[in-house]
Design a protein with these regions (language model features):
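Membrane-proximal cytosolic segments adjacent to transmembrane helices
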Residues: 4, 97, 101-144
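Helix-coil boundary and interhelical linker segments in multi-pass alpha-helical membrane proteins
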Residues: 15-27, 78-87
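Hydrophobic core segments of alpha-helical transmembrane domains in multi-pass membrane proteins
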Residues: 26-36, 87-95
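N-terminal intrinsically disordered, cationic/polar leader segments
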Residues: 40-44, 51
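Juxtamembrane helix-capping/reentrant segments at transmembrane boundaries
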Residues: 48-67
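Mid-chain, well-packed structural core segment of small domains
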Residues: 62-96
C-alpha cells in the first residue's frame, strides 16, 4: 500500500515540476527580490528602532507564498485558455515593481540619502513634492 502511495505522490510531484518548469526563472527572481526586501526591511527596522517580531516575519513569508500562488495561478489560467500571450510575466512584472519599490523605501530609511527619496518621488509621480514623499515614508515606518 505504501509503495503505491509513494509512486502516486512521486508521479504527481514530477508532473507538477514539469508543468510549472517554464516559470522557474520568474519564481527565482521573485525569491531574490523578496529576500532582498526582507533583509533591507530588517536593517530599516533596526535603524528606525522598530522591534522585529515573528508576526512581521510571518507576514513576509505569507506575502512570498501569495506572490508565488498568484504567478502560478496566472500561468495555469494562461495554459488552460491556450493563450499565446505570456500574461503571467505581466503579473510577475507588477509584483517585481512592488518589491523593488519596497526595497527603495527601505534603502531610503537605511541611508538617509536623498537619492532614494528622489527615485521614489519619480516612481510615485511626485517629483516636485519631496517633502510629501518623506512624510509618506515616515508614516509607513511608524505603521510597521
Amino acid at each position: 500500500m505504501w509503495g503505491f502511495l509513494k509512486s502516486v505522490f512521486c508521479s504527481a510531484w514530477g508532473f507538477c515540476v514539469a508543468y510549472f518548469a517554464p516559470t522557474w526563472h520568474v519564481l527565482t527572481i521573485l525569491s531574490i527580490l523578496v529576500v532582498a526586501d526582507w533583509v533591507t526591511g530588517i536593517f530599516a527596522s533596526r535603524k528606525a528602532n522598530i522591534d522585529i517580531t515573528s508576526r512581521r516575519l510571518t507576514h513576509s513569508v505569507v506575502k512570498w507564498l501569495c506572490y508565488i500562488t498568484a504567478i502560478l495561478l496566472t500561468f495555469m489560467a494562461e495554459q488552460a485558455l491556450t493563450l499565446e500571450f505570456n500574461f503571467y510575466l505581466f503579473a510577475a512584472g507588477y509584483i517585481y515593481g512592488c518589491e523593488i519599490l519596497s526595497i527603495f523605501e527601505n534603502l531610503a530609511v537605511i541611508s538617509d540619502s536623498d537619492v532614494y527619496l528622489r527615485i521614489l518621488a519619480v516612481i510615485r509621480g511626485k517629483s516636485k513634492d519631496m517633502a510629501g514623499v518623506k512624510d509618506a515614508l515616515n508614516e509607513e515606518m511608524k505603521g510597521k
